[in-house]
Amino acid sequence: MKKFSLIVAVCANGGIGIKGDLPWRLRQELKYFSRMTKKIQDSGKRNAIIMGRKTYFGVPESKRPLPERLNIILTRDPSANAYPSEVMVCTSMQEALKKLDEAPLVNEIENVWIVGGNAVYKEAMQSDRCHRIYLTEIKETFECDAFFPEITSDFQLVKNDDDVPEDIQEENGIQYQYRIYEKVPK
């Protein structure tokens, strides 16, 4: 059973989105998201990203599905929207994880990333398979209508990976910092 990690950018008021979009424009932070969710050790494999329907359709049409990763969309009504053949549509997180544990995907996927939105993050954080949260802490408040769930004491802040900068980043006058939380084994 593969563990998974979450990746998210959160502003000072806990916000992660507004009207299906990001409230900020941080090109380097988006590059970090792309690099982290594509990073593999085995060149014969790729990563999977799991997201809710609204998160998927929040990605500009020209950029979806997100390249070089298996895009898995969670939706209660798979027939309500048309999806490209290269994405996998599941009705639950449980179904998606089950498919990732079975052939052929178990041999093709290296890492699994949860990329939003709120309900998907919340369910993922409660799972025993949740390993880490890669959180970009944006040091400013933005108007948001979607929020990241509270990080409970089940998670502790850990040292950043070698390829994750520890110092404060700044872009377009907005400061942010990369943090990693790891789930404490029970």
Curated annotation (Swiss-Prot):
Q: Which GO terms describe its biological process?
A: dihydrofolate metabolic process; folic acid metabolic process; one-carbon metabolic process; tetrahydrofolate biosynthetic process
Task: List its EC numbers.
Answer: 1.5.1.3
Which residues hold substrate? 29-34, 69
Q: Which Pfam families match?
A: DHFR_1 (PF00186)
Give me the residues that bind NADP(+), please. Answer: 9, 15-21, 53-55, 75-77, 116-123
Catalysed reaction(s) here are:
(6S)-5,6,7,8-tetrahydrofolate + NADP(+) = 7,8-dihydrofolate + NADPH + H(+)
Query: One GO term of the cellular component aspect?
Result: mitochondrion
- Keyword annotations for this protein? NADP, One-carbon metabolism, Oxidoreductase
SUPFAM superfamilies on file: Dihydrofolate reductase-like (SSF53597)
One Gene Ontology molecular-function label: dihydrofolate reductase activity
Q: Which top EC class is named for this enzyme in its record?
A: oxidoreductase
Q: In which pathway does it act?
A: Cofactor biosynthesis; tetrahydrofolate biosynthesis; 5,6,7,8-tetrahydrofolate from 7,8-dihydrofolate: step 1/1
**What sequence ranges are listed for the domain DHFR?**
3-183
Family (UniProt): Belongs to the dihydrofolate reductase family.
Relate the protein's function as given in its record.
Answer: Key enzyme in folate metabolism. Catalyzes an essential reaction for de novo glycine and purine synthesis, and for DNA precursor synthesis.
From the Swiss-Prot or TrEMBL record, give the protein name.
Dihydrofolate reductase
Please report the organism this UniProt entry assigns to the protein.
Aedes albopictus
